Structures are given as structure tokens and as C-alpha cells.
Amino acid sequence: MGVFCRRFGVPLIDGGTVRLPRLVGLSHALDLIMTGRKVEADEALRMGLCNRVVPTGQALEAALALAHQLAAFPQATLRADRASALAAEGLPLQQALLQEWAGGRECLAEALRGASRFAAGQGRHGEF
């Protein structure tokens, strides 16, 4: 992984100079943008460019396991929380908190069902 277009004089016009600093911070982003060097998996993980590294040949299996894990969660709240996290970037704290509340409020029925299941003893120790 890397910003290989640097080697050929091709500018980053695909949003790379905007998105990369938001993902890994300005220092790491400038390092990658300016040098065009290759980044190995362990370094990408350390700098926050990726969230997980799996052994060679196991990427599909790991991706499917993650997809199944996410699919098992209540979907309305999962989607609302994801949307809130994405929308909050760059917002003032108070505005982001209000937006989070607005999105979460729409999912309260699902949350009450989940709380009832937990109170009944389900879901303890991370198991459902």
C-alpha cells in the first residue's frame, strides 16, 4: 500500500490529500504523500491506516467473519451509530452530541428490546 502515483508525477486528485490526513494524521499522511513509499501491513496497522491484519490467504475468511459479526447486531442502532460517527467529524462538540441524540432517539424501541434481553440474562459476557 502506498501513494505510488508520486513516482510518476501524477497528482492526488481522488481525495487522497483530504482523506489520508483524517485517517492517519497529518504527519503520517505527509510522509506517505511526499515519499510515495510502500507501507507494509504492520506499519499500516500502527499508523491507523488499517484496523486489522490477518495472515496471508485468510483475508476473505476474516472479512466474512467480521461481516457475520456485524450482521448479528441490531441493525437500526448499528446504522445510526455509524452515521453519527461519520457525520460528527468536524462538527463542534455540542452539535455532534445533538445529532447523535437525534439519530439514537429513532432507535429507542430496538434499544428497549435489547435492554430487556440483557435484564433477562441474555448477552452477558459478550454472548447472545
Write out the residue ranges for each language-model feature.
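Crotonase-fold acyl-CoA enzyme core
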Residues: 3-76
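C-terminal alpha-helix plus adjacent terminal tail
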Residues: 36-41, 61, 65-68, 72-128
